């Protein structure tokens, strides 16, 4: 039995929740998010809270209910507060710039790298070596950050590359003669 699913998700004032079968839509000041839940999960909205439980006849109902609770909690946080992900560029000549919804990266290649941001995600560069991604959808923010990092992952000898702000890069010792 899932302990996560037993805790209800509190719906704050200003957040609108619509349940249409297994499709849940949550609307708030930062936008609107929609998700289709597994058939094994039953969601109830009462007293400004969402409660979760398994449907009858499903073996993995509690496990799926815990997953659904975590996903919907992230959606509620996203439409109220939003999510932020910070990236750092480490290396000589590595720099970033944002023009509209395109992130322009200079990462030591013979050409600049332009990355198109999906709808609902904004980026800003406080400095030339920092990128701050903001948005309501936690999964999309994480995917965009992973895509930007994949252009030049931190290498293990000098630590050069694109890294998350809280990432610790373990460096190896150079080969000795």
Curated annotation (Swiss-Prot):
Q: Which GO terms describe its molecular function?
A: rRNA binding; structural constituent of ribosome
Q: One cellular component GO annotation, for this chain's record?
A: cytosolic large ribosomal subunit
A GO BP entry is: cytoplasmic translation
The entry's keywords? Ribonucleoprotein, Ribosomal protein, RNA-binding, rRNA-binding
InterPro entries associated with the record: Ribosomal_uL6-like, Ribosomal_uL6-like_a/b-dom_sf, Ribosomal_uL6_a/b-dom, Ribosomal_uL6_bac-type, Ribosomal_uL6_CS
Family, according to the entry, reads as follows: Belongs to the universal ribosomal protein uL6 family.
NCBIfam families per record? L6_bact
Subunit structure, briefly? Part of the 50S ribosomal subunit.
- Describe its function: This protein binds to the 23S rRNA, and is important in its secondary structure. It is located near the subunit interface in the base of the L7/L12 stalk, and near the tRNA binding site of the peptidyltransferase center.
What's the name of the protein? Large ribosomal subunit protein uL6
Give the species this sequence originates from: Citrobacter koseri (strain ATCC BAA-895 / CDC 4225-83 / SGSC4696)
As recorded in Swiss-Prot or TrEMBL, the protein's gene is named rplF
């Amino acid at each position: 039995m899932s302990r996560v699913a037993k805790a209800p998700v509190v719906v704050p004032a200003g957040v609108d929740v619509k349940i249409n079968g297994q499709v849940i839509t949550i609307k708030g000041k930062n936008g609107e998010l929609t998700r289709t839940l597994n058939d094994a999960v039953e969601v109830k909205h009462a007293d400004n809270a969402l409660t979760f439980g398994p449907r009858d006849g499903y073996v993995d109902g509690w496990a799926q209910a815990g997953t659904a609770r975590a996903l919907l909690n992230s959606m509620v946080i996203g439409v109220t507060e939003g999510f932020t992900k910070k990236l750092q560029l480490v290396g000589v000549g590595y720099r970033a710039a944002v023009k509209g919804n395109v992130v322009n990266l200079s990462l030591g290649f013979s050409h600049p790298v332009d990355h198109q941001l999906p709808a609902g995600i904004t980026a800003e560069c406080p400095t030339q070596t920092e990128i701050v991604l903001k948005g309501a959808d936690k999964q999309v923010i994480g995917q965009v950050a992973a895509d930007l990092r994949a252009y030049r992952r931190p290498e293990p000898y000098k630590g050069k590359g694109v890294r998350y702000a809280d990432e610790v890069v373990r460096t190896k010792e150079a080969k000795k003669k």
